[in-house]
């Protein structure tokens, strides 16, 4: 019987120059595998706890030596000799060792790193691709990417309020074709920005971060880039937004669009979105209202839920209990899936299955602090999420995921790319 022989951890760097956890596993058959945990810039209040050292003398307090120590001691001892092939059991043990709802003892960056590394080691031990090990024979769907090509909000130092302006390549038959179109649009966008005298430096996720006059100008420029690249807005390339409204709201529930000099209540924000959706080929809005504004979310879903995808990120934080409440109250119609928000592979899978059973769309997602780890690419295919957010066609930590998806598409002879049928049009 194959069993877990050793677990180790190391403090490594993420794409923003901050430390993060690398967990490594060795099995008794000699298999070795590792995983690197990502980290977010804008985070939901109900996310699982990312354990940081708080020592201002090291990495400005952001070190993860405590999380690494928890892996090397408590976690390694409890998982020593356990079969790696029962992921649910592994993750239940991790939950039991921690003893809290949000991994505040061990740190979700410790538990997720171990959970991912064991899943990867198990797949390698069985000589299976990770997507096949986690998803079985039904893992066939290549996700439609949501590519963040203009950054604002907390992901960039500029005057744009919304955090992400994304393109979704819908009108294509393969993932490879969709990625090519996206890359071409990205290069046209760069040329347009440069020609207009804007800076073409990029944000955390590879998108450009120009100083633009309002929150609509990025959409106008993106549409120009789509057309210059020879593609049709909406039919082939649609627009998606991540507003990250929890970063815009004050203690009185008012939303501050500083770039436009506006202060709006929930109804005002909803009217603002209705105007945008009527005016532009927008198919998805993420975190359109604050994570605490459930009454506003209910109204937003009533107004726009039959027209576009309304994604809960900070709203649901990949947590099945919160998602269940949202389903019961008819809040949103899609969920962003970030494994580090919940702390283990199994709990992530549970949230996806709950969403899919209730016809909520799922978007597998990276974080702004990423690495060369490609786990989420396989995970998206394994769970047939149908959509993925993993940045622009720039920055190698983003490209790594796209290249892995290209590889997977070649491996699966009957792979499906469902961009054309993803949304009602």
Curated annotation (Swiss-Prot):
Pfam families: Enolase_C (PF00113), Enolase_N (PF03952). One of its GO terms (biological process) is glycolytic process. Its cofactor is Mg(2+). It is found in: Cytoplasm; Secreted; Cell surface. (2R)-2-phosphoglycerate binds at residues 163, 338, 367-368, 389. Mg(2+) binds at residues 242, 286, 313. Keywords: Cytoplasm, Glycolysis, Lyase, Magnesium, Metal-binding, Secreted. SUPFAM superfamilies: Enolase C-terminal domain-like, Enolase N-terminal domain-like. GO terms for molecular function: magnesium ion binding; phosphopyruvate hydratase activity. It is an enzyme of class 4 (lyase). The active site is at 205 (proton donor), 338 (proton acceptor). It catalyses: (2R)-2-phosphoglycerate = phosphoenolpyruvate + H2O. HAMAP family: Enolase. NCBIfam families: eno (TIGR01060). Belongs to the enolase family. This is Enolase.
């Amino acid at each position: 019987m194959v069993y877990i022989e050793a677990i180790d951890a190391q403090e490594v760097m993420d794409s923003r120059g901050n430390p993060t956890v690398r967990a490594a596993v060795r099995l008794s058959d000699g298999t070795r595998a590792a995983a690197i945990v990502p980290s977010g810039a804008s985070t939901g209040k109900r996310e699982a706890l990312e354990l940081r050292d708080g020592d201002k003398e090291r990495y400005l307090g952001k070190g993860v030596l405590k999380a690494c120590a928890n892996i090397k001691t408590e976690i390694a001892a409890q998982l020593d000799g356990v079969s790696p092939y029962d992921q649910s059991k592994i993750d239940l043990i991790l939950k039991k060792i921690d003893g809290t709802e949000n991994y505040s003892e061990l740190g979700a960056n410790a538990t997720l790193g171990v959970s991912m590394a064991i899943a990867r080691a198990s797949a390698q031990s069985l000589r299976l691709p990770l997507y096949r090990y986690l998803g079985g024979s039904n893992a066939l769907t290549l996700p439609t990417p949501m590519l963040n090509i203009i950054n604002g909000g907390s992901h960039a130092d500029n005057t744009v309020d919304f955090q992400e302006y994304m393109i979704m390549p819908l009108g294509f038959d393969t993932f490879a074709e969709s990625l090519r179109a996206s890359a071409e649009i990205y290069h046209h966008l760069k040329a347009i920005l440069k020609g207009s005298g804007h800076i073409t430096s990029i944000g955390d996720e590879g998108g450009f971060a120009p100083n633009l006059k309002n929150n609509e100008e990025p959409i106008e420029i993106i549409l120009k880039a789509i057309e210059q690249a020879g593609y049709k807005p909406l039919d082939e390339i649609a627009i998606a937004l991540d507003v990250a409204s929890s970063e815009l709201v004050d203690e009185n529930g008012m939303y501050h669009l500083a770039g436009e000099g506006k202060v709006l209540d929930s109804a005002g924000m909803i009217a603002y979105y209705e105007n945008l959706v009527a005016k532009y080929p927008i198919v998805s809005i993420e975190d359109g209202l604050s994570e605490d504004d459930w009454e506003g979310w209910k109204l937003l879903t009533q107004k726009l839920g039959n027209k576009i995808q309304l994604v809960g990120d900070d709203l649901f934080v990949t947590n099945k209990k919160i998602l269940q409440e949202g389903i019961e109250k008819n809040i949103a119609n899609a969920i962003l899936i970030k494994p580090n928000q919940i702390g283990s592979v199994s709990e992530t899978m549970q949230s996806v299955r709950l969403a899919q059973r209730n016809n909520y769309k799922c978007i597998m997602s990276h974080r702004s602090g990423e690495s060369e780890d490609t786990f989420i690419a396989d995970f998206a295919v394994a769970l047939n999420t149908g959509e993925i957010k993993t940045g622009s066609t720039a920055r190698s930590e983003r490209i790594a995921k796209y290249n892995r998806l290209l590889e997977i598409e070649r491996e699966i002879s009957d792979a499906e790319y469902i961009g054309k049928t993803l949304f009602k049009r």
